């Protein structure tokens, strides 16, 4: 594995290997000294063209816990805001000796361009590109599911037979796209639920069932319910009548939460719009994995950086 750009092209064995290495990294986080010397002497650049809190901090923590040198680059206040191209930025990073570049970009396909261009000889990790993909978010979601379902015996396990329902703004969600492909690769059955206006045209070609009625989807007794944020910043039109109407029809409120099995899992990639797509009670319930997902993110990103920069030496 030279780059981590997409879950659509990620092989099953590579996905399970990464999740297993993430288990080892999670064990490290349980120690008093949460650090390994694995990437000492390596330089990891976080190249963020979009605002981010969770993902950026998570990648910073992951690289530092592997003893890498970390450079964080924000487009705001940089030469990019003055018109510098992605090519020129990449060549600048190459001159600085970057070994890995974690890139978040508003344009779909930007990380793939960076990886294939020859502008920089570094491992590329996609930290979210437009509405295309967000592979490490899907991996940390799968890691969290696997731990909840299989506990300490999760190493080497897939998600065969697990029913996952993803609800909300599918149209603008790179998280949904990455999850659909990865979960299918790991054997899960995925159902997407959204108003028709928030489903992309190409969704009919995805390996997932499509529904428009959340109550009907919950009646099918899914193992996992993943709620997605309404991405108002990407909307330039009315995709539903009102937020109240959206919440009434597609929000995970207290009454719908009460219908779920006691051992079901409620997920949200964050940030949450409490009271819109998910109630406070659902977000804070014992079924919720929201905080676990944040912790899992560091472990999964440690595993990704380790495998890209040192873990494949044995392969």
Swiss-Prot record:
Binding, carbamoyl phosphate: 54-55, 104, 134, 137, 270-271
Q: Enumerate the GO terms in the molecular function aspect.
A: amino acid binding; aspartate carbamoyltransferase activity
Task: List the GO biological process terms.
Answer: 'de novo' pyrimidine nucleobase biosynthetic process; 'de novo' UMP biosynthetic process; amino acid metabolic process
Q: Which InterPro entries match?
A: Asp/Orn_carbamoyltranf_P-bd (IPR006132), Asp/Orn_carbamoylTrfase (IPR006130), Asp/Orn_carbamoylTrfase_sf (IPR036901), Asp_carbamoyltransf (IPR002082), Asp_carbamoyltransf_Asp/Orn-bd (IPR006131)
Q: Write out the residues that bind L-aspartate.
A: 82, 174, 229
Catalytic activity, as annotated: carbamoyl phosphate + L-aspartate = N-carbamoyl-L-aspartate + phosphate + H(+)
A Pfam family of the record is OTCace_N
**Which cellular component appears as one GO term in the record?**
cytosol
Its pathway, per UniProt, is: Pyrimidine metabolism; UMP biosynthesis via de novo pathway; (S)-dihydroorotate from bicarbonate: step 2/3
Q: What is its EC number?
A: 2.1.3.2
Sorted UniProt keywords:
Pyrimidine biosynthesis, Transferase
Does Transferase appear among the keywords? Answer: yes
- State the family named in the UniProt similarity comment for this chain: Belongs to the aspartate/ornithine carbamoyltransferase superfamily. ATCase family.
- Fill in the subunit field for this protein: Heterododecamer (2C3:3R2) of six catalytic PyrB chains organized as two trimers (C3), and six regulatory PyrI chains organized as three dimers (R2).
Protein role: Catalyzes the condensation of carbamoyl phosphate and aspartate to form carbamoyl aspartate and inorganic phosphate, the committed step in the de novo pyrimidine nucleotide biosynthesis pathway.
Q: Which PANTHER family match?
A: ASPARTATE CARBAMOYLTRANSFERASE, ORNITHINE CARBAMOYLTRANSFERASE, MITOCHONDRIAL
Can you say what this protein is called? Aspartate carbamoyltransferase catalytic subunit
Query: What gene name is listed for this protein?
Result: pyrB
């Amino acid at each position: 594995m030279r780059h981590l750009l997409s879950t659509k092209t990620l092989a099953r064995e590579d996905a399970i290997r990464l999740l297993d290495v993430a288990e080892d990294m999670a064990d490290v986080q349980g120690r008093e000294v949460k650090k390994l010397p694995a990437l000492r002497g390596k330089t990891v650049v976080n190249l963020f063209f979009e605002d981010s809190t969770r993902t950026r901090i998570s990648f910073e923590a992951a690289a530092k816990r592997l003893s890498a040198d970390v450079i964080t680059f924000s487009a705001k206040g940089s030469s990019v805001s003055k018109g510098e191209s992605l090519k020129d930025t990449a060549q600048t990073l190459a001159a600085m000796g970057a070994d890995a570049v974690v890139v978040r970009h508003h344009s779909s396909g930007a990380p793939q361009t960076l990886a294939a261009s020859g502008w920089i000889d570094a491992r590329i990790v996609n930290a979210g590109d437009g509405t295309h993909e967000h592979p490490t978010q899907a991996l940390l979601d799968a890691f969290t599911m696997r731990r909840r379902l299989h506990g300490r015996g999760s190493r080497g396990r897939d998600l065969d037979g697990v029913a996952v329902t993803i609800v909300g703004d599918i149209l603008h969600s790179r998280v949904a796209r990455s999850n659909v492909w990865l979960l299918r690769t790991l054997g899960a059955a995925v159902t997407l639920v959204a108003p028709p206006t928030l489903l992309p045209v190409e969704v009919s070609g995805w390996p997932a069932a499509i529904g428009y009625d959340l109550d009907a989807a919950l009646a099918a007794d899914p193992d996992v319910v993943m709620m997605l944020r309404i991405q108002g910043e990407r909307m330039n039109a009315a995709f539903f009548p009102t937020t109240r109407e959206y919440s009434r029809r597609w929000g995970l409120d207290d009454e719908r939460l009460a219908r779920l099995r006691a051992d079901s899992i409620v997920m949200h990639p964050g940030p949450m719009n409490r009271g819109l797509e998910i109630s406070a009670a659902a977000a804070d319930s014992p079924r919720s994995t929201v905080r676990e997902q944040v912790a899992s993110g560091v472990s999964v990103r440690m595993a990704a950086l380790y495998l890209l920069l040192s873990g494949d030496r044995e392969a």
